[in-house]
Amino acid sequence: MMESSTILQRRALFNEAGDIELHKRRMVGGNTTNLNDFNNMKYPWVSKWYRQAMNNFWIPEEINMSSDVQDYRNLSAIEKTAYDKILSFLIFLDSIQTANLPNIGQYITANEINLCLTIQAFQEAVHSQSYSYMLDTICSPEERNDILYQWKDDEHLLARNKFIGNLYNEFQDDKSVLALLKVAIANYVLEGIYFYSGFMFFYNLGRNNKMPGSVQEIRYINRDENTHLWLFRSIIQELQKEEPQVFTARNVRLFRDMIREGCEQEIKWGDYVIGDQIPGLNRHMVADYIRYLGNLRCENLGFEPLYEGHRVEPESMSWVSQYSNANLIKTDFFEAKSTAYAKSSAMVDDL
């Protein structure tokens, strides 16, 4: 067993002395050969996760964005500003994920978990591809660049990115078990809380028959993020079993505070970018939903809830889960690919 301050060692790539017995496999501090054997996995949930993630494969350019070109020009000034800022936020954090996940994987010694992290990194790259396709379709090159880099000049955007980015950077400098857990919690916050006011904005556009292509892109991104949330929740739960001594009362308070901070930032962000001027949404709806998510995320890790009440999904926001529920997106079993989105006649091949 390790202590919070124990420094993790980067796993060797070739390790002829690595353990092959399943009972010796560990999330961290193990002695892996890095051999991927799909018939012998220590963690039973990995096989189901892997198949689900693989079945989720989608191609952004197959979603028809033709209606969005005109819709984007017809959005109100407030809706357009929200669209641009939310997209800038999503673009940056999905981009940094592709760099962060391999960094985490170097210190994970359960090879089947690294398979999952590799798939997640690939899906984050697809999300970046999706955002690029969305911008290329609806924007001029000048507008595109302005949206891409708004996070550098908008203090609200920058503060949000710094919270997650600094936690990721911390693990660059501190390879302790506690630092790894903090970066895992940061991922959990990112996938399970940080994106949701953005997602609900797009889904609200969909409810009002606006930007259907963008809504469908976001819906598929949301489905992927749900599997990523499942992955990091499971990683944290396995670490709770394997390294229970690290989950001291003090550290659990730290983790809960991180989740709380993520919630409060998401609520402030919703107040700033959505407020009370978007038809169909207001700041109270956003805040209630985020507090509900914060409690849900804590309870799923066995932590005490953060907010009094807020234990069930707000009735006024039930449409969010209807849009984001992966089970509502049809999958062709034989082709093992999604068939729920309309294919565009134009496929770009310039990546």
Curated annotation (Swiss-Prot):
Transmembrane segments: none annotated. Its cofactor is Fe cation. The keyword Metal-binding applies. It catalyses: a 2'-deoxyribonucleoside 5'-diphosphate + [thioredoxin]-disulfide + H2O = a ribonucleoside 5'-diphosphate + [thioredoxin]-dithiol. SUPFAM superfamilies: Ferritin-like (SSF47240). The keyword Transmembrane does not apply. Keywords: Deoxyribonucleotide synthesis, Iron, Metal-binding, Oxidoreductase. One of its GO terms (biological process) is deoxyribonucleotide biosynthetic process. Its EC number is 1.17.4.1. It is an enzyme of class 1 (oxidoreductase). Fe cation 1 binds at D94, E124, H127. The active site is at Y131. Fe cation 2 binds at E124, E191, E225, H228. GO terms for molecular function: metal ion binding; ribonucleoside-diphosphate reductase activity, thioredoxin disulfide as acceptor. CDD domains: RNRR2 (cd01049). Binds 2 iron ions per subunit. Provides the precursors necessary for DNA synthesis. Catalyzes the biosynthesis of deoxyribonucleotides from the corresponding ribonucleotides. Belongs to the ribonucleoside diphosphate reductase small chain family. PANTHER family: RIBONUCLEOSIDE-DIPHOSPHATE REDUCTASE SMALL CHAIN (PTHR23409), RIBONUCLEOSIDE-DIPHOSPHATE REDUCTASE SUBUNIT M2 (PTHR23409:SF18). Tetramer of two alpha and two beta subunits. This is Ribonucleoside-diphosphate reductase subunit beta. It comes from Treponema pallidum (strain Nichols). The lineage of its organism: Bacteria, Pseudomonadati, Spirochaetota, Spirochaetia, Spirochaetales. The gene is nrdB.
